[in-house]
Regions:
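Active-site Gly/Thr loop motif
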Residues: 223-277
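Active-site-proximal alpha-helical segments within enzyme catalytic domains
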Residues: 102, 148-152, 191-214, 263-280
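A short, well-structured edge-of-sheet supersecondary motif
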Residues: 10-40, 272
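Active-site SXXK
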Residues: 29, 47-72, 99, 148-153, ...
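Short, small/polar residue-rich loop motifs at catalytic or cofactor-binding pockets
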Residues: 17-20, 44, 260-261
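Structured C-terminal helix/loop/strand segments within mature extracytoplasmic catalytic/sensor domains
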Residues: 260-329
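Active-site helix/loop module of the DD-peptidase/beta-lactamase fold
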Residues: 66-104, 124, 128, 157-193, ...
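Peripheral terminal and inter-domain segments
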Residues: 312-470
Length: 470
């Protein structure tokens, strides 16, 4: 494939202001392009949000193929130990196949951000959701469905989805290693979201499905399951474009399994192409792939006008890949206020975030930002004129789609925008999120107004200001 197609795609990302973190493209099972925008790397697992559902899909496929589950199994029967109220007639009709096709009959979207703050059983919570449509007749995407699928796998097999994939050869055969999966309070993998995985390993899963479940000559998932999941074979429930966590586009030219903020696994059987993308954007990555790769390359193949390889274009692409970078730097900045606020503990006015204190440790080449709230005390070291990598427990659920990990790696940068304004930028290399803190100081350094914002989020992108005084 001509490097021009990939260069056009990278240009399209820039033009659309689509922040891509990692991209890997393979044709006929061979990698033709791999790019990582600093600070994101090939080795860092990246959160997939609802892209996780394709792994739940694989676990269900294994459980069905090995006879632990059947597509016609009734959800409220398998999960009867988690039912806390009388089961309605419509609830009693919901089957596993309805969860997979998002036709369970629920009447509202349930996001993972609704579940993550819960410390009680997620499954009990989801099973109380009313079923208002005849199962199998009404499509409505809801993450609650896939969480129930995960629970059914565990109840039927005695293993979590991750344990099942690890013990049946799925992960071993594909060579998937740097792979984690969040758990619910009641002991199930978060089937709807919470996987962190590298772009390379994500692409392997796409290749597996496109190959009909075969990897290196070995049948890992059944071909029947892969065909049903992708949607090659239609059922009564999935007559539309959505099959089992795969969605068809352009009459089956390509299929995607996606997660929030640009996480995209795309397969194009016509081109025998797999593309894995991890990102932090609101842009439609699948549409950009169609406009710049799948359609023009497919049309050129049909017309017999595929460009010949060009050494100059290949060199240009290689150079472009080497210089992919999201870590801006500015000229050295400083402010006399830095001395006034250095090593001073400021007390927060009452606020919805539970923040109690803030302090800054100001140096010539870095600033330590320390904040205390109900979860404890959290520090991030921010480089001046340089990005610094660290590990932090900083509370972030309210800017991170209700994800809160004990600690996260972070790259941090500090810049004085003017004499009274300090801006801190935090990039979390395993997440989609980029947080910006704007600290505005009074002239005498006795008061700070702090506003935190984020690039993408299911909640507010800009938090309410928190005011601190000495």
């Amino acid at each position: 494939m001509s490097s021009q197609y990939i260069l056009d795609l990278l240009d399209a990302f820039d033009y659309a202001d689509a922040e891509v973190h990692n991209i890997l493209m393979a044709i006929d099972g061979e990698v033709v392009f791999e790019g990582h925008y600093a600070p994101y790397t090939a080795l860092d697992p990246h959160i997939m949000f609802s892209g996780t559902k394709i792994f739940t899909n694989a676990a269900v496929g294994v459980a069905v193929t090995e006879g632990y589950l059947h597509l016609e199994d009734y959800v409220y029967d398998v999960l009867k130990d988690y039912v806390t109220q009388d089961v309605s007639e419509l609830q009693s009709k919901v089957q596993l196949k309805h969860l997979l096709t998002m036709t369970s009959g629920v009447d509202r979207f349930m996001s993972g951000s609704e579940l993550r703050p819960l410390t009680t059983s997620w499954i009990e919570h989801i099973l109380t959701e009313p079923i208002v449509h005849e199962p199998g007749t009404y499509y409505l995407y809801s993450s609650g469905n896939t969480m129930l699928s995960s629970a059914m796998v565990t109840v039927a097999t005695g293993k979590t989805c991750l344990e099942l994939l690890n013990t049946t050869g799925f992960c071993e055969e594909l060579g998937i290693k740097n792979f984690t999966w969040d758990m619910s309070p009641d002991g199930f993998n978060a089937g709807h979201g919470g996987i962190k995985i590298t772009a390379e390993d994500l692409a392997k899963v796409g290749q597996l499905y496109m190959n009909g479940g075969v990897w290196n000559g070995k049948q890992i998932l059944s071909k029947e399951w892969c065909d049903l999941a992708i949607g090659y074979e239609k059922t009564v429930e999935n007559q539309g474009d959505y099959a089992y966590h795969w969605t068809a586009y352009e009459d089956g030219l390509y299929y995607t399994a996606t997660g929030s903020y640009g996480q995209t696994l795309a397969i194009c059987p016509k081109l025998n192409m797999v593309i894995a993308i991890q990102a932090g954007t609101k842009q439609n990555i699948g549409e950009l792939l169609y406009q710049n790769i799948f359609k023009p390359y497919g049309d050129a193949l049909d017309a017999g006008t595929v460009p010949e390889p060009d050494d100059a274009l290949s060199a240009a692409l290689a150079k472009r890949a080497e210089n992919l970078n999201l870590m801006f730097t500015t000229d050295f900045t400083a402010s006399p206020i830095g001395e006034l606020v250095d090593d001073v503990t400021f007390t927060a006015a009452e606020n919805q975030y539970g923040i109690t204190t803030l302090s800054l440790d100001v140096h010539d080449d870095y600033i330590d930002y320390t904040m205390t709230d109900a979860r404890g005390t959290h520090t991030i070291r921010n480089g001046i004129w340089q990005w610094l990598k660290g590990e932090t427990s900083m509370t972030s659920n309210y800017t991170h789609h209700q994800y809160q990990y004990p600690t996260e790696p972070v790259y941090a940068y500090a810049e004085w925008k003017d004499a009274n304004t300090l801006q801190l930028t935090w990039r979390f290399p395993e997440l989609a999120f980029v947080d910006t803190l704007t600290l505005t100081f009074s002239d005498d350094g006795s008061q700070i107004g702090m506003v935190r914002s984020v690039n993408v989020n299911s909640g507010p992108l800009v938090c309410d200001e928190v005011v601190f005084t000495k």
